């Protein structure tokens, strides 16, 4: 089962099973989803793919690195969790689907959708008017909500948390929109501008949601009222808890497990054997500290390995019409987390640093 299939199923419903013997099918989802929206299935799948790629990028140097095994396990009802990481998965899923639907809409890929022209000709501010082709985020929001939220049919606190994080992901797409303008006027005077709203790069949305993940808020539900199950008391407790939470915030209910330690029952492989970065150009502070975070703070040492890589080089074009290359071997130094000779307990403060914001 490839990453897109695993994550696409997760996008549709965290509570659905992923069958180990068969690939996930968009049609399977649509058996219970909105059948009127068959035209959008390829966009939904593409959005799911962009979601998993962005998740892996954002968490590449974190202890939890968006592993496919953990995503697959989290689709099983008995193994569902409502951690900080699950919150991000829901948000980036919803954002990816909405983003792709919006983009395809603006490109004219759907018969019933195009640019958002609701503001064209209206004054937007001093010296500029609305024009051009604004990305139709309201369309993307509406269809993504139907797809991603449709199968979250529970009425408990976990379902409410998932739906909240889905919405936070969609709001992230809107929050990162950029205004693009074109100048008009004699001799390039730019006396007036025509402006429209454009989707940001999806990487910007991923970074925005990563910050939201780092700042995610833990909910403390009223357990006495929650014992009533799906009763009015249950719904009242959920409503009271959510009343003070901003719609743009990511929320979770359970503390994250110790990602330093291998736990195969949860799909976690620990950080032993993980690569980290110690040097290199244009590294962020978060990347430069990855060896400390993944290795030292998990009771592991940093092991230096010299690895030979083979690649094509000195390529030349020969008339006509071939390109001939030489084969070059290069030795590079890479760093990995490895066991110490003596077992040492991880630093007590390592868990606290786990969700520190990137530098």
Swiss-Prot record:
UniProt KW Glycoprotein keyword: yes
Organism domain of life: Eukaryota
GO cellular component: apoptotic body; cell surface; extracellular space
Subcellular location: Secreted, Extracellular space, Extracellular matrix; Secreted
Pfam families found in the cross-reference section: wnt
Expression tissues: Expressed in the margin of the pregastrula embryo destined to be the future mesoderm.
Residue ranges crossing the lipid bilayer per the database entry: none
UniProt key word Ribosomal protein: no
Changes after translation: Palmitoleoylation is required for efficient binding to frizzled receptors. Depalmitoleoylation leads to Wnt signaling pathway inhibition.
Keywords of the record: Developmental protein, Disulfide bond, Extracellular matrix, Glycoprotein, Lipoprotein, Secreted, Signal, Wnt signaling pathway
GO MF term (any one): frizzled binding
GO terms for biological process, alphabetical: anterior/posterior pattern specification; brain segmentation; canonical Wnt signaling pathway; cell fate commitment; cell migration involved in gastrulation; cell proliferation involved in pronephros development; central nervous system development; determination of dorsal identity
Gene3D superfamilies: 3.30.2460.20
Disulphide bond pairs: 55-66, 105-113, 115-133, 181-195, 183-190, 260-298, 276-291, 295-337, 313-328, 315-325, 320-321
Residues that carry a glycan: 104, 263, 282, 348
Lipid moiety-binding residues (O-palmitoleoyl serine): 187
Signal sequence range: 1-25
InterPro entries reported in the protein's UniProt record: Protein_Wnt-8A/8C (IPR034312), Wnt (IPR005817), Wnt8 (IPR013301), Wnt_C (IPR043158), Wnt_CS (IPR018161), Znf_C2H2_type (IPR013087)
Function, in words: Ligand for members of the frizzled family of seven transmembrane receptors. Required for mesoderm and neural ectoderm patterning during gastrulation. Involved in axis formation during embryonic development, via activation of canonical Wnt/CTNNB1 signaling. May be involved in the specification of the spatial patterns of expression of Gsc and other regulatory genes leading to the establishment of the embryonic axis.
Similarity field: Belongs to the Wnt family.
Protein name: Protein Wnt-8a
Native organism taxonomy: Eukaryota, Metazoa, Chordata, Craniata, Vertebrata
């Amino acid at each position: 089962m490839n990453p897109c299939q695993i994550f696409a199923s997760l996008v549709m419903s965290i509570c659905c099973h992923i069958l180990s013997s068969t690939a996930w099918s968009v049609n399977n989802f649509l058996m219970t989803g909105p059948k009127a929206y068959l035209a959008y299935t390829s966009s939904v799948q593409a959005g799911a793919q962009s979601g998993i790629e962005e998740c892996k990028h954002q968490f590449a140097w974190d202890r939890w690195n968006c592993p496919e095994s953990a995503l697959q396990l989290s689709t099983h009802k008995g193994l569902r969790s409502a951690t900080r990481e699950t919150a991000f998965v829901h948000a980036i899923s919803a954002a990816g689907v909405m983003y792709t639907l919006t983009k395809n809409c603006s490109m004219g890929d759907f018969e019933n959708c195009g640019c958002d022209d609701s503001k064209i000709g209206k004054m937007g501010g001093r010296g500029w008017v609305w024009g051009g082709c604004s990305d139709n985020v309201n369309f993307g929001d509406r269809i993504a909500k139907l797809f991603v939220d449709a199968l979250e049919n529970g009425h408990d606190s976990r379902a409410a948390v998932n739906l909240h994080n889905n919405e936070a992901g969609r709001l992230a797409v809107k929050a990162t929109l950029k205004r693009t303008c074109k100048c008009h006027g004699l001799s390039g005077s730019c006396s007036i501008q025509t402006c429209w709203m454009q989707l940001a790069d999806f990487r910007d949305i991923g970074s925005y949601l990563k910050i939201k993940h780092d700042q995610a808020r833990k909910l403390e539900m009223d357990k006495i009222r929650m014992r009533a199950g799906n009763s009015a008391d249950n719904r009242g407790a959920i409503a009271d808890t959510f009343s003070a939470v901003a719609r743009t915030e990511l929320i979770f209910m359970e503390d994250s497990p110790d990602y330093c330690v291998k736990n195969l029952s949860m799909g976690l492989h620990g950080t032993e054997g993980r690569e980290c970065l110690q040097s290199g150009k244009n590294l962020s502070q978060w990347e430069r500290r990855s060896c400390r975070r993944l290795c030292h703070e998990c009771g592991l040492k940093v092991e230096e390995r010299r690895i030979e890589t083979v690649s094509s080089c000195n390529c030349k074009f020969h008339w006509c019409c071939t390109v001939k290359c030489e084969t070059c071997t290069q030795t590079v130094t890479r760093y990995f987390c490895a066991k110490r000779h003596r077992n040492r307990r991880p630093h007590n403060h390592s868990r606290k640093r786990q969700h520190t914001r990137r530098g």
